[in-house]
Amino acid sequence: MRVAPMTSRFLDACRRRPTDVRPVWFMRQAGRYMKQYRQIREKHGILEICKRPDLAATVTLQPIEVLDVDAAIIFADLLLPIEPMGLKLKYEKGEGPVIGNPVRTSDDVDSLSTTNTDELGYVGEAIQHVVRALAGKVPVVGFVGAPFTMASYMIEGGASRNFVRTKKLMYSDETLWRRLMGKIVDVLAPFAHSQVAAGARAIQVFDSWVGALGSDDYVRFAAPYSRALIERIRSTGVPVIHFGTGASGFFRELHAAGGDVMGVDWRINIDQAWMDISYRSAIQGNLDPVALFAPLPELRTKVQELLKRTGTRPGHIFNLGHGILPETPVENVKAVVELVREFRP
């Protein structure tokens, strides 16, 4: 399946083509910092919003209306694919995601299903709602987790600080690890394809926990599966954004796993990151999310410095180095969009 190309400022930048101004959008641009989102969350839980296409579409569209950004990332949850695999997912207040039956043994891996991804059809329905509402104004971005991050959640049973269980399995039974990672890819790839079929015109692969690894372990245990996933997504013809948190120490290795666009967190200067990969992909990022709390003069300076670092080379998409934080002043987010649009190198 290959989709017909769509023209937009954001997609042009993904392909390293010249744009009139720098495209801008934000990870977690739909979230608690917005009053409109908080009003919906007062009545509905995270998973309920994700599984109701009407609500997911409404939340996805809110930042387009409020911020006038250049892309609409679908509102969903990274861990949704683990449910059709047979795992029990819930959200505990103050704890984040909790998996009731984590994967710890060979039997656990054997029991994981890879054939029920049609149960995630509600995400595609939400994308279709958003595509209709936008009527070509901006493209929709779909997303999946990277295999290492998904495996970490599945093994740990939720978020982790040191990833002891994950690394213990990885080091002690490499065969089992590779079976698990292969199954994860076999679920994530068709899920990404279904998002493209529904109308997504780019897919972001989030490797939220990859910073737990060193360079050698990344290359050995994670990169082959990220590469396999990205190659399968790219077969649809849409650009893939590859974003890893805390990966500045092995950014070249991350890039070697693939991606039309490489997302950068705030821990490395974006010009250095781009140079490190010889400008062979577009680059996305990388304002520190906490900079959005700065007074406007300081925020203006930071935004302009970042934009100057990427110069006039086509292929920079302005974003944060991670998601927007819940307490962020919405007026500051709006100000960043205006500053990016006004910037002239």
Curated annotation (Swiss-Prot):
GO terms for cellular component: cytosol. CDD domains: URO-D. Keywords: Cytoplasm, Decarboxylase, Lyase, Porphyrin biosynthesis. InterPro entries: UROD/MetE-like_sf, Uroporphyrinogen_deCO2ase_HemE, Uroporphyrinogen_deCOase. Substrate binds at residues 28-32, 77, 153, 208, 322. The record marks 77 as: Transition state stabilizer. It is found in: Cytoplasm. It catalyses: uroporphyrinogen III + 4 H(+) = coproporphyrinogen III + 4 CO2. The keyword Cytoplasm applies. Its main location: cytoplasm. PROSITE patterns: UROD_1. Homodimer. Catalyzes the decarboxylation of four acetate groups of uroporphyrinogen-III to yield coproporphyrinogen-III. Belongs to the uroporphyrinogen decarboxylase family. This is Uroporphyrinogen decarboxylase. It comes from Solibacter usitatus (strain Ellin6076). The lineage of its organism: Bacteria, Pseudomonadati, Acidobacteriota, Terriglobia, Bryobacterales.
